Amino acid sequence: LLMGVDTGSGSREDPWAGNSDTMILVTVNPQTKETTMTSLERDILTNITSDGETVQAKLNSAYAQGGAKLAIKTIQDLLNIHIDRYVMINMKGLVQLVDKVGGITVNNPFDFDISIEENEPEYTAKIAPGRQEINGDQALVYSRMRYQDPEGDYGRQKRQREVIKKIVEKVLSLNSLSHYKGIIESVSDNMQTNISLDSNSLLQLLGYKDALSTIHQYQLKGEDATLADGGSYQIVTSKHLLKIQNIIRKALGKKEIKTLKTNAYLLDGDEELKNSSSSKNDTPVATSEEAPVYQEYNQLPVVPSTQDTGVVTPQSSVAPVTPVAPAATESSS
């Protein structure tokens, strides 16, 4: 799981106190030599369970409530998949990372400069239209702009995946252990991970190089909804969420599932797709695969496990909030 936290730069001095506004689930399969990146919409309405209490809230608030551990658990429940490793970086870390690899090349598809200065005056970098070589400050702006994008946050997420892909390509082109160590050291104060990043692990990462050369990109989307609390949320449909779950499972070599298990609040409440055990208020029951959520690793595996991790155990649900006139069409990946 890749998480970007909206802190650590400009006036947001605390490096980790904020929301995980970027959440991308990455699968790397050295057997198929393919990688997937699935962006998760930050405003998806989910049931977040912590210390025995469940609240309905936006997906990105799980990190603010309980740090990386709760964020991982919540996303694990959302997608009904075990997540064993994570990398989290804040805004300053992204700037440092892009600068350390010597900048990246992106394509601004708009006929105007990409800028966030109007809403965030402390960030003055701009990206001109067309193909551009950009530095770290520009990469941060390129990854954060959404108000001028016709696709809003979904457009921003596309650019975030583009930036990650370009960074990966640049890092792999270096093909040097000393370069890798230097890159990691440069962002160490602004990155958190449960992956050991010693020399042995970095050498093992080279074994994933072929898989990282082919990256497929997906997007978990929802429908716009204004709820009783006045907040704007994204609410997923059963069919779309099940499709995304199976895309991820296929990438990991797991069997396709027919029954949706999730902690998301569903727009349609499709009884044929969702977990057969639901509350009297018709709120989906949150579930997760039985496996450790958060743990330290001494080294990377040579080949990721493709085995299912066990029986799905339901958690408690909460009373639903009725959406007001949400769109009825299903989002596509």
Where are these regions (language model features)?
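Non-catalytic, solvent-exposed segments at the cell envelope interface
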Residues: 1-333
